[in-house]
Amino acid sequence: MTNKFLFFFLLAAVTFAACNKSDRKMTNDQLQMTNNLIVRIAEIEVNEGYLEAYLAAAHNVGTKSVESEPGVICIFPMQVKDAPNTIRIVEIYRNDEAYQAHLQTPHFLEYKQGTLHMVKSLQLVATEPLAPEAMPLIFKKY
């Protein structure tokens, strides 16, 4: 009886895993879009005395960009816990055209001009996704 139960349990588990895996396969369109993604991390050091104003501006531009720009998949600002004036922003754009369009939007230009004096340093780090098949699962907008 125990062997029979174990057999059916394993059969059910394998079937569930196979069904679940097939739902996660990327379509050709999704795979093509993933190949065109612009994924970067902005590393920002904020000048002393400007942290609150910078955080508000970063939150504002991130929210407006994701809400209003179809090619902006993610703009996710984060603050480093042990270094509050150190900000990291994960940026994901559908393609280079979406990124270039983002740079021309009124909300980005306002953010850029309004925070120039607040930023001590800025470095943009280009990256490659290691698990592109996870993108549709993580980002519903994708």
What are the roles of these predicted feature ranges?
Residues Y50-V72:
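Short amphipathic alpha-helical segments
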Residues M1-F5, K21:
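Positively charged n-region of N-terminal signal peptides that target proteins for export
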Residues N20-I38, F76-A83, K112-Y142:
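Glycine-rich beta-strand-turn "strand-cap" elements at beta-sheet edges
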Residues T15-A18:
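C-terminal motif of bacterial Sec signal peptides marking the signal peptidase cleavage site
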Residues K64-C74, I92-T127:
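An amphipathic, aromatic/His-enriched active-site/gating alpha helix that lines ligand/cofactor pockets
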Residues F5-A13:
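Sec-dependent N-terminal signal peptides
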